[in-house]
Amino acid sequence: MRLAYWMYEGTAHHGVGRIANSMRNVHAVFHAPQGDDYVNAIFAMLDRTPNFPAMTTSVVSGTDLARGTIRLPDTLRQVEERVHPDLIVVVASCSTILLQENLEIAAQHAGLQCEVMVYDANPYRMQEIVAAESLFTDLVKRFAKPQPRTERPTVNILGPASLGFHARHDLISLRRMLKTLGLEVNVVAPWGASIADLRRLPAAWLTIAPYRELGLRAAIYLEEQFGVPALLDAPIGVQPTLRWIERLRELLAQAGADVPMPPLTAFSLDGMSAPSAVPWFARTADMDSFSGKPAFVFGDATHVVGVTRFLRDELGMPIAGAGTYVKHQADWVREQLTGYVDEVLVTDEFQVVADRIAALRPELVCGTQMERHTSRRYDLNCMVISPPTHIENHLLAYRPFLGFDGADVIADEVYTTCTLGMEKHLIDLFGDAGLDLPEKTERTPVAEPAPVAATVESPQPQNEPAIAVASAPSLTSAPATPTPAAVVDPVWAADAEAMLKKVPFFVRGRVRGNVEKYARQRGHAVITAEVLLAAKEELGA
């Protein structure tokens, strides 16, 4: 555990909350100080469900610590009386774990009728993804019992969960494809599953676990312990979906079920046309221009691999770079992206990713909410393809990422993300003639930076641009010969900004980056029109 400005994953008890909030008649109780109940607000804001989050905070206060008392037994009794759950999962937050209290004994003193599970989610060893995956796997191991196989072929779907990225939409897409194949769903878990449903998991003929982050270990356990074969691929894209369907039919055939392949039109929404428009749309003039637009992809393991392959294999876009923050899946990502990128960026520090994006200046960034902020800073196109996300990525409408429907959704996102903004380019070229737009407020000229001595005693803040200047040059004349002893992050003068606006928007970011690089190499603290012209002359742009 570490303090961070932004984090790609939530804390361990956040992951526990995702599992409890996904399941029916399961409730999480957090042994935590008042400040750690922010998790409840996150679920209430983002999850878009009519129910209150299935979690309660048993508050630990300074008074309790001074008196040597603990409120947990009373809280557990109140939860049982109010909610009547089948299972209560008790977990300490990242703050109270430091107290090293024995929550097992405290839970026993509550004298509950329902089952209680004290889960050791140590934030010094795990974060959201590992905590959620480990808890779900433990629940499957605890409750899954040997069952006779269902009469007709059925499948389990493991992985969709509360606050999952488009998880409910993916579930609809998977159900549609399975129904087209004539297959029934045995259990979906953790989303909507009860403890009784977990007991029925071994009755299925096959387990589908499309996400590397959640459901993978449980699917492997069911295969090893009960002989239920597992399909662990994610059908992201048209060709991967076709291969996924074929693999599903092969596994069921090995289990003794013959699943005939219906015509492809049966998978479409109208039942008459092709299941996806991507194959022909990728060959149109609209998409032909995308073949030269480099993309950078970053996020969780599942979506990074799926989207990277989709962009290059089906849309013809070159991949400038790819990476993931899920470190325990890094080797799998490297294996899957062999031949797509020379190196996979593995980091959970958003500033490292931001620096890579700034260096590459791709035409399209596919990432998380953090990459959206970074792209806005550098005026780059960005689409969100992975958690963490904000409210706009928890949609009410049907927007899956898996299956044929998901391929169309991703292609639409790529197309609209890269082409919207053309009106901005036209306004840059022709002004607002005929548009009746209000006059744009003139930018306030950038003031000359005050001289700052670069000393060890006065370091610059890590997340703020550092300006180290011996003496601020005039904004109207080209700076003198560089003094590269101190690295600078140059400031743009008003005349240079005005000149930069004349550059077409789709290459403006790259020009800005090249000019700033030129200025840094020569020690220019302020980029004036003269500096910009000098950079243009030297770079030949």
From Swiss-Prot:
[4Fe-4S] cluster binds at D36. The keyword Cell membrane does not apply. It catalyses: chlorophyllide a + oxidized 2[4Fe-4S]-[ferredoxin] + 2 ADP + 2 phosphate = protochlorophyllide a + reduced 2[4Fe-4S]-[ferredoxin] + 2 ATP + 2 H2O. Gene3D superfamilies: 1.20.89.20, Nitrogenase molybdenum iron protein domain, Proto-chlorophyllide reductase 57 kD subunit B. CDD domains: Pchlide_reductase_B. It comes from the Bacteria. Keywords: 4Fe-4S, ATP-binding, Bacteriochlorophyll biosynthesis, Chlorophyll biosynthesis, Iron, Iron-sulfur, Metal-binding, Nucleotide-binding, Oxidoreductase, Photosynthesis. Protochlorophyllide reductase is composed of three subunits; BchL, BchN and BchB. Forms a heterotetramer of two BchB and two BchN subunits. NCBIfam families: DPOR_BchB (TIGR01278), PRK02910.1-3 (NF002789). Belongs to the ChlB/BchB/BchZ family. This is Light-independent protochlorophyllide reductase subunit B. It comes from Chloroflexus aurantiacus (strain ATCC 29366 / DSM 635 / J-10-fl).
